[in-house]
Amino acid sequence: MENNRNFPARQFHSLTFFAGLCIGITPVAQALAAEGQTNADDTLVVEASTPSLYAPQQSADPKFSRPVADTTRTMTVISEQVIKDQGATNLTDALKNVPGVGAFFAGENGNSTTGDAIYMRGADTSNSIYIDGIRDIGSVSRDTFNTEQVEVIKGPSGTDYGRSAPTGSINMISKQPRNDSGIDASASIGSAWFRRGTLDVNQVIGDTTAVRLNVMGEKTHDAGRDKVKNERYGVAPSVAFGLGTANRLYLNYLHVTQHNTPDGGIPTIGLPGYSAPSAGTAALNHSGKVDTHNFYGTDSDYDDSTTDTATMRFEHDINDNTTIRNTTRWSRVKQDYLMTAIMGGASNITQPTSDVNSWTWSRTANTKDVSNKILTNQTNLTSTFYTGSIGHDVSTGVEFTRETQTNYGVNPVTLPAVNIYHPDSSIHPGGLTRNGANANGQTDTFAIYAFDTLQITRDFELNGGIRLDNYHTEYDSATACGGSGRGAITCPTGVAKGSPVTTVDTAKSGNLMNWKAGALYHLTENGNVYINYAVSQQPPGGNNFALAQSGSGNSANRTDFKPQKANTSEIGTKWQVLDKRLLLTAALFRTDIENEVEQNDDGTYSQYGKKRVEGYEISVAGNITPAWQVIGGYTQQKATIKNGKDVAQDGSSSLPYTPEHAFTLWSQYQATDDISVGAGARYIGSMHKGSDGAVGTPAFTEGYWVADAKLGYRVNRNLDFQLNVYNLFDTDYVASINKSGYRYHPGEPRTFLLTANMHF
């Protein structure tokens, strides 16, 4: 297994050209820029540069006042064109364009993850997903039908958005009405009974008003998986008043409904590193892998969710250089599911005979019935001005936010065991029934922030920002008394069995100060070097609204604990080459995370744990020629425990679910006016798995390559077709693995998607 921890030499050669290009971009970029220089006697011809559809030049968030090329952070912007060309219908698929980012973790033991369970630079980032700069709560899959672009910011984002994951954030930008009329529609069919349709209508009404309607419907089975299905529908109407004037009002609504059959994964038997959990089950060592099509759930398994979001944004241009914006949003995400997973320890195996085909494993029912709500009002002011010879790009604002979550208690669901090699899903345990043992969390936040980029000279910039958050979190939780197993409590005298009894009722208030500072120097008009330092904090209850009583226990949500703190240093360079159509970036980074909860020798818990993630990242986005577009990147990252208990299965100090090497590249070429071809590849390196005492489960997942391709054909100005092929070489790989290592999600096999796009 030792070899799995390193980047395979035979695969490294595939990256040689790309890595060499980006690691040495400074001299290369200078040479490219020099090609455009002229002598004093030459005739100078100025041509307008057409922006690349693969490299948006500006973040849509007004908190980022500088272009992406002059932002002292590692930032990847995935444009709508990239999403369309790749046929990426959800956020997780779109994020495959960012190296080292993905849904690699399948959950805790019998508790499976759902939705966009994203890991980035060694940390769970699923609680740091935003829509238009506003937190989006819920463990659901987010469709891209109403998305203009996806912005991925690596490193602490506490200064930008408040409490957040220590290693990055993801911001989905919604489509808005625009000052032109047109219709775009698409219809898709593909493998595994994939059917999808979208409609995007924008209509101008008068000189300054426009309406826009986006609609989506999709039904599909999961390729390579029996019984797993997904069905979702969405509608997003919006209207804009005052387009092209100094006063603009935008009204938006989003509704998405999903009815899915969740996937609890399959046993890891037969994977590299697996061994039977006991001598009595040694036959599993040579019984072979299970069929990856196997479904270990029941016919009653489901995952239903409903998202409703209403937004009002008003913008006023005070003058040509100053704009004030006010945004009010209400959003609710309701989700309930019954998901069955398997538990594969020695005590969970039943052996009727010596034939492994008769053996069974225990099933466990994962349940959730939750409602998340957010109400926020945010005011932002942006302005550009001079104080003497120093230029300023200022973004400042205030935010008022209330977030609430109710987890409805449900009665336990008991499930029979399942055959390891021949599972039967024809079981109907019924739906969920609430028992009143609810958990309620609420966080109120008032925040004020200010950012400024100072143009000291033509070539030298300084930037800084600070954000102050005052927060108050309340949490109460009840348990149905008289139960059994972990967390069970005895019923008080006179209280009937199954009655809800309050076990936690507590609150936490505090202030957070997050800040960032950076400097940038332009080596040439097209290239720069920069440094940046940022601090971000996550208070107890900050990621799930749950608090734990002070004084005992290992929960990071204890009210007597301090916020988790992350400090990130970054030094990098960015170059716009080929007439500024292509952006090349490279950066070295280090993130130190402190105040992790660790156990003391006497059995109590304290906050002395420290983690570190460090490495480098290189990226490319834009046009090599007017007909050739690319987006991609490579990262090497080392994530370790610096102080505290090792959490990897192999006993090393490595952080789990973090590939040491990751690469992604997508390229599209317009061969003729009517024919386009595209191809891409991505590599996810070997990852450590977490440890929880499970015996015999794999300590690593193996690295893998996946290739995709696309062929496009334009019939006329109103109609074109595109054929996407995913996992072109039908690679067998582990997409995610759970903490115990009993189960994993196999990667999708080779699939096809044919789409007709209509434009009017």
From Swiss-Prot:
MF terms (GO), sorted A to Z: siderophore uptake transmembrane transporter activity; signaling receptor activity
State where it is primarily located: membrane
Question: Where does it live in the cell?
Answer: Cell outer membrane
Q: Which UniProt keywords apply?
A: Cell outer membrane, Ion transport, Iron, Iron transport, Membrane, Receptor, Signal, TonB box, Transmembrane, Transmembrane beta strand, Transport
State if Transmembrane is listed as a keyword. Answer: yes
The cross-references to CDD domains, in alphabetical order and at most eight, read: ligand_gated_channel
Q: Domain named TBDR plug: which ranges?
A: 67-175
Q: Coordinates of motif TonB C-terminal box in the sequence? A: 743-760
What's this protein's family per the entry? Belongs to the TonB-dependent receptor family.
Q: Supply the name of the protein.
A: Catecholate siderophore receptor Fiu
Please report the organism this UniProt entry assigns to the protein. Escherichia coli (strain K12)
